[in-house]
Amino acid sequence: MVAFTDKPRFGTLLTAMVTPFTNEGAVDVDAAQSLAAHLVDGGCDGLVVTGTTGETSTLTDDENVIMFKAVKEAVGDRAAVLAGTGTNDTAHSINLSRRAQEEGVDGLLLVTPYYNKPSQAGVKAHFEAIADATDVPIMLYDIPGRTSIPIETNTIKALAEHPRIVALKDAKGNLGETTKVLAATDLDVYSGDDGMTL
């Protein structure tokens, strides 16, 4: 993902990492660390670990934490490490976010609650509860094609008032709405849709 804004907190170019597995189906820590180092050596400013590309919904919480720790150890301070800790369950998201914070991640990527289709008030309450329960900067992830619910522009504007909500990964595919967010907030906005960027 590429930032639309100048001097973004997490860097300009972030890569959503895959989660490598062994032939036995376990998380492959060595491969994850090798991949993370390779991506940073190749110019990535930040890595998203166990986001939706990293199969977070198929991992146990312990496997997620293994990945957070492994990637942070591999890259240290050479790149920002964001942990994909968003789920469709607020309490679960808070717990996983706190565990990511304990591993020293630089930020959290929180996808919109999927499947349940909450109202915009529910979306806002979900994200605010996680932000209130942690001390880590947060990037919201708006990908309605996968979650079935957008984060509407007015909801994003309201969430941008929270001191820990600092960025948006926008995969909505609507540059008009992206422009409104850029004009109305101080959020760092990243493109979550390569076709819209390139």
Regions found by a protein language model. Name each.
Residues M1-V2, Y190:
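Short amphipathic alpha-helical surface micro-motifs
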